[in-house]
């Protein structure tokens, strides 16, 4: 049985998630599988917005950016997110999912600019909205963009798709005794020094009482289970 527990959600996808087993770029089979799951969630009637990163193409804090002006490197990273957003939109279109891309940087010939009322209208019409170019400002991560856009559109939860299936007491790759938290409060995560998002994004979600669910994008069906409110990943709550 499948049902939705949330009416409107913000999904944060890292650019690295699009690489699959590749070292760079977009892995075709990975994006096809990912969009299958997104389409399945959209079919439940969930109003879905997505913030996507660009780390599979370029990151402002990556070794390749060393020696560059940080703001310039960050703008390059923002443009990488636009490329990913267009690829994701194209893949969703082939699944019959009506999708719009809005960018925090103006490239009018390619994508429409981020306009909050239009984004809200698209969501209400059942369209998937992909937010590209982060916040449009250097020195802010796409995690922060996810928290910001989530708050702006009135999302009920931020779903952070990662390579691990939740938040653990220690690094599960290094400590075999590490245990996964099913639920944890914002304050407890701070006390335990657990890295959920970068500090700015985490503080924004906490201040806006916007819960975060961390789950694995590589686990089949995890997105649907997270949206359905099942015990999937880790829920960070107020």
Curated annotation (Swiss-Prot):
Give the subcellular location: Cytoplasm
| Molecular function, one GO term | UMP kinase activity
Q: What positions does the entry give for ATP binding?
A: 12-15, 55, 59, 162, 168, 171
Q: Which residues bind UMP?
A: 54, 74, 135-142
Q: Which residues pair up as cystines?
A: none
Swiss-Prot/TrEMBL catalytic activity: UMP + ATP = UDP + ADP
Q: How is its activity regulated?
A: Inhibited by UTP.
Tell me yes or no: is Kinase among this UniProt entry's keywords: yes
Q: Which GO terms describe its cellular component?
A: cytosol
User: Could you tell me which pathway this protein works in?
Assistant: Pyrimidine metabolism; CTP biosynthesis via de novo pathway; UDP from UMP (UMPK route): step 1/1
Highest taxon of the lineage? Bacteria
Q: Which Pfam families match?
A: AA_kinase
The UniProt keywords, alphabetically, are: ATP-binding, Cytoplasm, Kinase, Nucleotide-binding, Pyrimidine biosynthesis, Transferase
Q: What class of enzyme is it?
A: transferase
Q: Which GO terms describe its biological process?
A: 'de novo' CTP biosynthetic process; UDP biosynthetic process
Please give the InterPro entries that the UniProt record associates with this protein: AceGlu_kinase-like_sf, Asp/Glu/Uridylate_kinase, Uridylate_kinase, Uridylate_kinase_bac
Please tell me where this protein is predominantly located. cytoplasm
Q: What is its EC number?
A: 2.7.4.22
Subunit structure of this chain's protein: Homohexamer.
Function, in words: Catalyzes the reversible phosphorylation of UMP to UDP.
Q: Which family does it belong to?
A: Belongs to the UMP kinase family.
- List the protein's name: Uridylate kinase
Q: Organism, per UniProt?
A: Bordetella parapertussis (strain 12822 / ATCC BAA-587 / NCTC 13253)
